[in-house]
Amino acid sequence: MVNFTVDQIRAIMDKKSNIRNMSVIAHVDHGKSTLTDSLVSKAGIIASARAGETRFTDTRKDEQERCITIKSTAISMYYELTENDLAFIKQCKDGSGFLINLIDSPGHVDFSSEVTAALRVTDGALVVVDCVSGVCVQTETVLRQAIAERIKPVLMMNKMDRALLELQLEPEELYQTFQRIVENVNVIISTYGEDEGGPMGNIMIDPVIGTVGFGSGLHGWAFTLKQFAEMYVAKFASKGEAQLSPADRCKKVEDMMKKLWGDRYFDPAGGKFTKTANGPDGKKYPRTFAQLILDPIFKVFDAIMNFKKEETAKLIEKLDIKLDTEDKDKEGKPLLKAVMRRWLPAGEALLQMITIHLPSPVTAQKYRCELLYEGPGDDEAAMGIKNCDPKGPLMMYISKMVPTTDKGRFYAFGRVFSGVVSTGLKVRIMGPNYTPGKKEDLYLKPIQRTILMMGRYVEPIEDVPCGNIVGLVGVDQFLVKTGTITTFDQAHNMRVMKFSVSPVVRVAVEAKNPADLPKLVEGLKRLAKSDPMVQCIIEESGEHIIAGAGELHLEICLKDLEEDHACIPLKKSDPVVSYRETVSAESDQMCLSKSPNKHNRLYMKARPFPDGLAEDIDKGDVSSRQELKTRARYLADKYEWEVTEARKIWCFGPDGTGPNMLVDVTKGVQYLNEIKDSVVAGFQWATKEGALCEENMRAVRFDIHDVTLHTDAIHRGGGQIIPTARRVLYACQLTAEPRLMEPIYLVEIQCPEQVVGGIYGVLNRKRGHVFEESQVMGTPMFVVKAYLPVNESFGFTADLRSNTGGQAFPQCVFDHWQILPGDPKDAASKPCQIVADTRKRKGLKEGIPALDNFLDKL
């Protein structure tokens, strides 16, 4: 079944209960791409001999060179289960052939937006953890995202070869290591997931059920408890039991699996399982997992790595491993690889785990629909998604754009949730800003071609039914990054993805040769398409700004821009950080502004948010879409707001969703509602560009205390009210002790203990502070967690490596905003310097504008 044709894949696509859409997620360098190779080779796409070295899914040249995954890549594989294995599947199934759509995603935190895009189109995730270093910060971030999207995880403990060969652990220690990782992962799942009564049921991972795999991607071997349970069931079976039916056999194997993990012990003399650790004569029994599973593996490793020829031959015969003739002459590591691959093939174990335990689209879309679809839960589109109905209206989500070999064109990459997408079908293409009933951000166009994504290749295909992952040609001109494609007139959008990091680092770019400007603009447009996270902004001064998640992310983006998208030489500025403006006290006076015609007056004050509220708005716990009373209740209970005020929040800003509020605390003002729209517009404008240096505001609450208006409607139109509202908001900000906020990274550094001192030195120089330091159990490694201002993080990795002899590995991820100490109005302070630089860069007037510009006297 090596080169299966498109027609064969197409035939399985209709069996939607036999499709598995899954992504591989993990911390950077825990071996995702290497592990994916075992799966790909099992499905017969690359030669099994090279699996583990090819990294088939790293398609770009820079990915191969740097040995990191940068873009997520999709690949479709076919896998057939035997009769016996089919019995283990608890959901509905249709035949024994399975189509597995696998997406290999990057582990590096700067590319976590790629992971988000991958998660949206899949239903299950294979979480890979390096069993030596355990659960790291990125594992947690990504797993948290997966659970928020209601994606079912299964776990793979990778790099067991390191645990055996480098650390030389005892079987019992290794068991404890595994047990600890399983517990850590389950803690994360239970913290962020819904409880067992939720729509997904119990999603905790448990080796006993078979949702945990162990193995080594590099050597190409892996197993779950199921594989060993099957061996032992066959071994202990008496002669008459050989003809068991698959269902009975399945039950026996499942019973056996329960005995192979946890506090179960094996009495080798009597050949019995017991639950007590000590026998009657006081001698300790070995744990079943150590004795029956790890011990054989240890024996194989020991015999081969110590070149014990006779023992090796005996073991190979006993384990019934058939080696090729060329493998028989190998010794040492090459022989070890060959033997382990034959005995416990990784592809087999993992593909079984995926098909048995991950949900099919039919199962998953039932509980994912409410999270995916913005519209009502009972319209045609929602019903189509819930039932994964090929006869329903087409509903498809595009999660990212993939550049084609043809410069400047993109494949739209996404998943069909309901209906069928086919070549030449006329569809509605809806961007993220589309609202039902309006015409903006909506195009009616035919799809030119539908294609199948296969890692480095694409295959044309006639049509694709729901539950599958697909690429579209000819849609890229109408969407920027993501969007919904549908044939249903009243369809709402699919929800926009929430990214776990935000673009806080910016670089200004310009063309070296001014004549190339049009190419640069075109290139920036393409760059914005090709990366789910990056933002391209044009400042008023005419500068082109690129914003990304971190240094590495920006470096890759700029390289892409220069080589692929714009194809011109560029000049780049040093990286700059975006700041936020805020206030630190209540306004010291009531601020008044009069409208240009002197007939209307607005009175307002500003004050800071209580701690934690801005973060709640970012997370979406408090939002403009909530029901009034629930929101008021939440604010009253958690932040002790007055309920009357909490009910009269006019809006959030900037962009209607940001972490600032406009609250109406007036009593009985005439015509107030008629100017609401104008004041809100002024508020959105002011919070987007604050008074200090035109950066976004954050965590400011503006209270409208009183309004006097002209009785005549013509004298209080938008032209009178909007600029007035903006001026009074600026006055409020400047009278309430304005401050700047800077973004802070959470840095996790793994290092041996002898270099911890060097790390403290680097962090102190860069205004960082350590808030946690712990030792990884059973290893000489320390984990240091610290907060580091993004502004100081440039060159941090290089600095750290040079001070620790290259032994420390940092991971930076954006964590929170923090107020910069010092008053921006005081000429000697650091914030004042930053404000001056920013204003100069943006081409604004020097110095913070005087209060008199905004404040009027009665």
UniProtKB/Swiss-Prot annotation:
The protein's assembly and partners: Binds to 80S ribosomes. Actively translating ribosomes show mutually exclusive binding of eIF5a (EIF5A or EIF5A2) and EEF2/eEF2. Interacts with serbp1; interaction sequesters eef2/eEF2 at the A-site of the ribosome, thereby blocking the interaction sites of the mRNA-tRNA complex, promoting ribosome stabilization and hibernation. Interacts with habp4; interaction takes place at the A-site of hibernating ribosomes and promotes ribosome stabilization.
Protein name from the UniProt record: Elongation factor 2b
Any one GO CC term of the record: cytosol
Gene Ontology biological process: cellular response to xenobiotic stimulus; chordate embryonic development; translational elongation
UniProt-listed InterPro entries: EFG_II, EFG_III/V, EFG_V-like, EFTu-like_2, G_TR_CS, P-loop_NTPase, Ribosomal_Su5_D2-typ_SF, Ribsml_uS5_D2-typ_fold_subgr
Coiled-coil ranges (or none): none
Keyword Phosphoprotein on entry: no
Taxonomic lineage: Eukaryota, Metazoa, Chordata, Craniata, Vertebrata
Domain tr-type G: 17-362
